[in-house]
């Protein structure tokens, strides 16, 4: 169930844990994706079709990563965002150069990939293709 979010500032500290500590707080699927760079099945993620107002945080360390205002339906089968909260993610080029791996800047958890230049009508022409299992959604309640 979504929780209420108040702040949208990314974590500035580095979250480091041993594998046994990550296993204690993550589900087996979360561990496989976040810590072993896996990918969840296309179209099966909890947040693929969620477009409520809120914040998407790292499921591993709770660092806010994406605002719902940057989420869009790309049709790829995973949650898609055109931009992250500044400083929240790291991008690392993969072999071939077309895709960039994205990880949480605080805990290095694998989130997914960024693909650029696909022509989506967004402000950045980027698609951050993120595994739902890497995320935790917090609804922003209207006041």
From Swiss-Prot:
It comes from the Eukaryota. One of its GO terms (biological process) is protein repair. InterPro entries: Met_Sox_Rdtase_MsrB (IPR028427), Met_Sox_Rdtase_MsrB_dom (IPR002579), Mss4-like_sf (IPR011057). Its cofactor is Zn(2+). Binds 1 zinc ion per subunit. Its EC number is 1.8.4.12. PROSITE patterns: MSRB. It catalyses: L-methionyl-[protein] + [thioredoxin]-disulfide + H2O = L-methionyl-(R)-S-oxide-[protein] + [thioredoxin]-dithiol. Disulfide bonds join 76-129. GO terms for cellular component: cytosol. Gene3D superfamilies: Peptide methionine sulfoxide reductase (2.170.150.20). Keywords: Cytoplasm, Disulfide bond, Electron transport, Metal-binding, Oxidoreductase, Redox-active center, Transport, Zinc. The active site is at residue 129. Zn(2+) binds at residues 58, 61, 104, 107. One of its GO terms (molecular function) is metal ion binding. It is found in: Cytoplasm, Cytosol. Residues 19-140 form the MsrB domain. Catalyzes the reduction of methionine sulfoxide (MetSO) to methionine in proteins. Plays a protective role against oxidative stress by restoring activity to proteins that have been inactivated by methionine oxidation. MSRB family specifically reduces the MetSO R-enantiomer. Belongs to the MsrB Met sulfoxide reductase family. This is Peptide methionine sulfoxide reductase B9. The gene is MSRB9.
């Amino acid at each position: 169930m979504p929780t209420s979010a108040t702040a949208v500032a990314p974590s500035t500290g580095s979250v480091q844990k041993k594998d046994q500590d990550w296993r204690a707080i993550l589900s087996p699927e979360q561990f496989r994706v976040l810590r072993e760079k896996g990918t969840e099945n296309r179209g099966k993620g909890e947040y693929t079709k969620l477009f409520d107002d809120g914040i998407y945080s790292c499921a591993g360390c709770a660092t806010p990563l994406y605002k719902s205002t940057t989420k869009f339906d790309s049709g790829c089968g995973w949650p898609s965002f055109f931009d992250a909260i500044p400083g929240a993610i790291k991008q690392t080029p993969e072999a071939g150069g077309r895709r960039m791996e994205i990880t949480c800047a605080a805990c290095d958890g694998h989130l997914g990939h960024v693909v650029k230049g696909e022509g989506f009508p967004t402000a950045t022409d980027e698609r951050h293709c993120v595994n739902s299992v890497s995320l935790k959604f917090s609804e922003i309640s209207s006041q």
